[in-house]
Each structure stands twice: as structure tokens, then as C-alpha cells.
Amino acid sequence: MAAKKLTHLDEKGAARMVDVSSKPVTSRSATAKGRVTMQPATLKLIAEDGLKKGNALEVARLAGIMAAKRTADLIPLCHPLAITKVEVDLKMDKKAGTVEVEATVKVAGQTGVEMEALTAVSVTCLTLYDMAKAVDRGMTIGDIRLTRKTGGKSGDYKAK
């Protein structure tokens, strides 16, 4: 099997934005997940909307949606895309002291939305941290990963 080549580097190793102009417009989607782990008392405050900064879950959800739309401004070689859907779900696990974040992004375009889904999850997690850091600076953010993608030349992907 031939080694895969990095598409964002030219033959001299210089960074470049990939030319997708000859690719067909297809329906594409990507889903990513991540987690914020915190003290049970912090999660209780979030669940009861008891933080001074406001409703942490809804602010974080909106931040994730906004981040997906701004991915090309944050990651230098990402294409700006006309995203057709961003959905951010947050699930609290009181026993584990976690908020699980899942983002799904869709587009009809010439390139995928994996980075947009990952960015949405990352910024959602960061926003949860920001909203609750006054009561719990020991929170951790982790396990951010792509879990699924559909469409495009490389085909579908589902994490194991």
C-alpha cells in the first residue's frame, strides 16, 4: 500500500491551501466528541443554572455553533464553507462528574467538515471551562476526537 501524502504541503514542503475547485459538490457531514470532567459540586451548579455567569450549557452550545462557522478564521489552511447545519449536544453524567459534548456539522460542498466539528467540540468544552472556572479550576478537557464522517472522495469513517 502506498504511503499517504500530506495534501497541505507542496513538493518543496511549503504550506498551501488545497485546490478543491475541480471536486464535485457533495453532501458531507462530520461528528466529533469531547468531555469536560469536573467536581460533582461544579456539575450540580451547572445543572441547576447556578453559575454567576449564567446558563453554562446554553452559552457553551452557542459558542460551539459559532466556532464551527469560524473554523477557517482559526485554522489557517481550512476552507471557508457555507455550512448548512451545526448541532451541539451536551449530556451531563452526574455520577462521573462529566459533560459529554457532541457536535455534528453538515455541508453541501467540495471539502469535508471534520475540522468544523472538532472546533465546535473544542470551543464548547473551553466555554464550559470558562463559565465554571471561578468554582473549579481543576476541570479537565479531553478525549476530543472525530467519531464519524460521511461523503467525499475518501469515503465514510466511523471510529471504533
From Swiss-Prot:
Substrate binds at residues 77-79, 115-116. GO terms for molecular function: cyclic pyranopterin monophosphate synthase activity. SUPFAM superfamilies: Molybdenum cofactor biosynthesis protein C, MoaC. GO terms for biological process: Mo-molybdopterin cofactor biosynthetic process. Keywords: Lyase, Molybdenum cofactor biosynthesis. It comes from the Bacteria. Pathway: Cofactor biosynthesis; molybdopterin biosynthesis. It is an enzyme of class 4 (lyase). InterPro entries: MoaC, MoaC_bact/euk, MoaC_sf, MoCo_biosynth_MoaA/MoaC, Mopterin_CF_biosynth-C_dom. Catalyzes the conversion of (8S)-3',8-cyclo-7,8-dihydroguanosine 5'-triphosphate to cyclic pyranopterin monophosphate (cPMP). Homohexamer; trimer of dimers. Belongs to the MoaC family. This is Cyclic pyranopterin monophosphate synthase. It comes from Parvibaculum lavamentivorans (strain DS-1 / DSM 13023 / NCIMB 13966). The gene is moaC.
